[in-house]
């Protein structure tokens, strides 16, 4: 399996066009992005942040992510427009163990850049990276309240494999269902 850090060196940064013609830059998150990433997450609507696994408005959470960057286990891909982060997608995977053939995708996009193809661009890049790494499956966990995200992933070939009722609680303690979606990738 090729090391992710080698793929990154050969692939990024790159430019992509949103559906409205806006040119954005895609690149890996780096240590110098700490403040910009915190500002990005603090600007996300509360209803988006409630569904995330961590409190991304806490500077300590972002600081830990930044100082523990390890592209060979988690690849954080950011979209930048005019020097501001407008999207964050991560591919989580382990090179060892019984899930070494699987990756998990996580995605957020700024509200101003939704319905312009940003999520599709970010996730498609992660799919390409996962394929390059020899991963066989990708998963995403989505609360049903994020129905637009569900349709985005469905459009990109992810299939619902489980709907777990009352399985998670958001940051305010409100119980919610969780949908698990899987996309099969070509086997190497």
Name every feature range the model reports, one short phrase each.
Residues 1-18:
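Acyl-donor-binding surface of acyltransferase catalytic domains
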Residues 107-112, 116, 144-145:
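Active-site acidic-Proline motif in GNAT/NAT acetyltransferases
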Residues 9, 54-101, 106-110, 123, ...:
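Acetyl-CoA-dependent GNAT
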Residues 23-36:
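A short beta-loop-alpha structural element at the N-terminal edge
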Residues 22-24, 82-88, 176:
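Glycine-rich phosphate/pyrophosphate-binding loop shared by adenosine-nucleotide-utilizing enzymes
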Residues 123, 130-142:
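Conserved GNAT acetyl-CoA-binding A-motif
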Residues 113, 117-125:
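Conserved acetyl-CoA pyrophosphate-binding loop and the N-cap/start of the following alpha-helix
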Residues 139-142, 154-176:
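Conserved catalytic-core motifs of GNAT/GCN5-like acyltransferases
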């Amino acid at each position: 399996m090729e090391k992710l850090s080698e793929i990154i060196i050969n692939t990024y940064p790159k430019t992509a066009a949103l559906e409205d013609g806006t040119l954005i830059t895609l690149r890996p998150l780096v240590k110098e992005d700490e403040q910009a990433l915190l500002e990005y997450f603090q600007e996300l609507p509360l209803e988006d942040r409630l569904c995330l696994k961590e409190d991304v408005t806490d500077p300590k959470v972002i600081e830990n992510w930044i100082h523990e960057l390890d592209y060979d286990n988690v690849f954080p891909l950011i979209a930048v427009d005019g020097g501001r982060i407008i999207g964050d997608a991560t591919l989580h995977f382990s090179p060892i163990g019984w899930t070494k053939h699987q990756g998990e995708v996580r995605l957020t996009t700024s509200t101003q850049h939704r319905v312009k193809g940003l999520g599709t661009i970010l996730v498609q890049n992660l799919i390409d990276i996962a394929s390059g790494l020899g991963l066989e499956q990708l998963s995403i966990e989505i609360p049903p309240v994020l129905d637009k995200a569900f349709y985005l992933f469905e459009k990109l070939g992810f299939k619902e494999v489980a709907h777990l009722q009352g399985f998670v609680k958001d940051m305010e303690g409100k119980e919610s269902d969780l949908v698990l979606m899987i996309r099969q990738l070509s086997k190497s």
